[in-house]
Each structure stands twice: as structure tokens, then as C-alpha cells.
Amino acid sequence: MLLRLPGTPPQPTPECKSVSLKRDCLPYLLCAILLAAAVSMMQLGLSPALTRQFATDTTAISQQVAWLLGLSAVAALIAQFGVLRPQRLTPVALLLSAGVLMSGGLAIMLSEQLWLFYPGCAVLSFGAALATPAYQLLLNDKLADGAGAGWLATSHTLGYGLCALLVPLVSKTGVAIALIMAALFATILFTIVSVFIWHYRTIK
């Protein structure tokens, strides 16, 4: 047992964080669902979108997809070491930036110009790399770390499941870029939720 020395101020009581989910945690979980769904639909939508340039040349399409996914990984690493590790932005700023970058990247990828797929995919991946740490830090302010990580993992799984449910429906449209458009819609919703989070935290 440790006793406080005479004349020393009492230590502040550490804040006790909740382990149960509250209503004000839902926007962060919705961001996680939308992010997972958007990235999954983008990756699944690359091959159909590239048929506009390569028709049925599956070898060329596969090569382009490999290059695009490799570029995505590089962009994510740049975001990690250039923005996240130096902690250049606050979590809310990261969240807003992620929404804008992901939406912008997917909007660029709607073009039929093949070369635009590369900057579009890089911008999207850069933004996606900013998103997860942002809402994880914000959620950790409200929940115990273990509880927050568990809920986010569940939300990501729900996002992948949502993507799996939407892919057959979206693909029925027959539009080559249908999945890219669906991913863009998800990132726009992500941005709207991010603005709501920013507004809520500002007025609180």
C-alpha cells in the first residue's frame, strides 16, 4: 500500500471509460462500416471498370489491377509515415480529410482515361489510410480501448458483409463502373457522417 507524502497534492482519479456501447458512439461505427464497404467495392469494381479499355483481355486487366493495388499500398504507407506518425492533424481533421480524399479519388476513377485510375486509386487509398486511426482515436475517447477495438472490428466485418450483399444487386445494372459509383456513394455518406461528427463535437 502506498501512502501520500505530507504536502503533496492528491493524484487525479483516472477517468473511467465505459465498455458498453452508447448512442453517441454510433456515428464512428457507421464510418467504419462505410469505409470497409467502399474500399471493398472499389477493389471488386476495378476489373469491370477496366473492361472499358481492355474489353475481354483478362491478362491486361489483371496486370492493371495488380499495379493499381500496389500503388494503393504505397499511398497508404506514405499516409502512415507522412501524416499519421508525425501526428500532423487532429483526429477530426483526419476524418474530414479522409472523406474528401476518398470521394475525390473515386470521382477521378469514373473517367474512361486509364491513366486517371492511378492518381484516383492513390488518392482514395491515401484517404482510407487516414480514416481508420481517426475514428478509432475518437471512439477511444468514449469507450475503453478493448471495447472500442472490438466494436470497430465488428463494424468492419459488417461493412464487408454489406459489400457482399450489394455487389450482385449493383452488378445487375450492367454498367461497367457501377461498383465504383456505389463506392463513391458510400464515401459521400462517410463524408456526411464525418461532418456531423465535427459539428457535434464543436457545439458540445
Indicate where each model-derived feature is located.
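Juxtamembrane intracellular "pre-TM" segments in multi-pass secondary transporters
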Residues: L5-C31
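Pair of pore-lining "gating" transmembrane helices in MFS-fold secondary transporters
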Residues: K22-M42, A122-F126
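Short amphipathic helix-loop junctions that connect adjacent transmembrane helices
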Residues: L44-Q64
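Transmembrane alpha-helices of Major Facilitator/SLC transporters
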Residues: Q64-Q87
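Structural signature of the two symmetry-related core transmembrane helices
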Residues: A93-A107
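Intracellular juxtamembrane helix-capping segments at the cytosolic ends
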Residues: A129-L143
